[in-house]
Amino acid sequence: VQAAVATQSQPFLIADEQVTPAQQLAQLHKALADALRLQILRLLKNESFGVLELCRLVAIRQSALSHHLKVLAKAELVATRREGNSIFYRRAFITDDDPLADLKRAAFDAVDTLDIPREQAEQLNQLQQERSELSLSFFQKNAERFSENQGLIVEREHYDSSLMDVVDGLGLSSAACVVEIGPGEGRLLVELARRFASVTAVDNSKDMLDLSRAAIAADGLSNVEFLLGETANARETLSGAADLVVFDMVLHHIATPASTFRDVAALLKEDGLLLVIELCSHDQDWVRNSCGDLWLGFDESELDQWAAMSGLRFEQGSNLALRNGFQIQMRVFRKHAN
């Protein structure tokens, strides 16, 4: 996957020119008047993909795909994000002040009713598995150097106190059920277990989970369950059980971050909370090899959009600037009550 996305062309930039409402409407209808472009929009429902990844999914040459992406971009149905030297495409966020917002939302709703062909679904699963294996392989090889690698980006003490202030300010009962995804060496996990009656640690790396288990044992705690697997596995056993789910500097290691929000929504009780501590979007591509990062942080709007699509409402957030140029964002989301 890494090689497949590293040599992509520049994104399509729409010229800053005056476009009449009639032209906007024509561009939108043109973009939607092609079955392949509708397939592309369907694939982009939950995730972002590089050009060569999309070529693989829809089985066409890059030159042909580039034409379709240009048409979709001109209609403002797709947008781009840069990941180092790579360009990823996603669905554009629809704003309320867009005069064609209702039409675009209706178009996306209609596209989402389309089935993904079996061949595409198989390629999609394979691609996501390859992304996951990149991250898993890194942590299998570097579990003992976790703190050292993480310290290249941020030292825990730079945000620990702010993080615990957020946790303590959530107003949760000590009887709360808490889930931490990707607990690393267990530093936050220990603090959560000291505060709450029931805590579950979820990680797809046995080596990392063993480090967390050792940290809990060293602190003499016995109220933590350990689950080897992904968030999709966790929702099978913990569906609707969690008062709080925490991602602490983990989302940028996850192959399908948007889908992960849907898993979290399934884990949470009604009115439950999601706390995300994550890097803001950056351009330091070296973290891929040095720290096992799949994504170069995230924009606030991306996290908010994925949360909203999963029935999670933004509650509060704050950013912390670090001396090395990275920024950390802390964002709290609440599950909508039915």
What annotation goes with each model-predicted range?
Residues 244-256:
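A short SAM/SAH-binding and catalytic strip from SAM-dependent methyltransferases
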Residues 179, 185-234:
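Class I SAM-dependent methyltransferase SAM/SAH-binding core
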Residues 20-64, 87-94:
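N-terminal helix-turn-helix DNA-binding core of bacterial DNA-binding proteins
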Residues 258-273:
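A short glycine-rich, Lys/Arg-flanked "PGG" loop and its adjoining helix->strand segment in the class I
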Residues 154-176:
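Conserved alpha-helix/loop element of class I SAM-dependent methyltransferases that forms part
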Residues 273-331:
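C-terminal alpha-helical "lid/dimerization" subdomain adjacent to the S-adenosyl-L-methionine
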Residues 236-245:
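A short acidic, Gly/Pro-enriched loop at the edge of an enzyme's catalytic core
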Residues 2-17, 96-145:
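Amphipathic alpha-helical dimerization/coiled-coil segments
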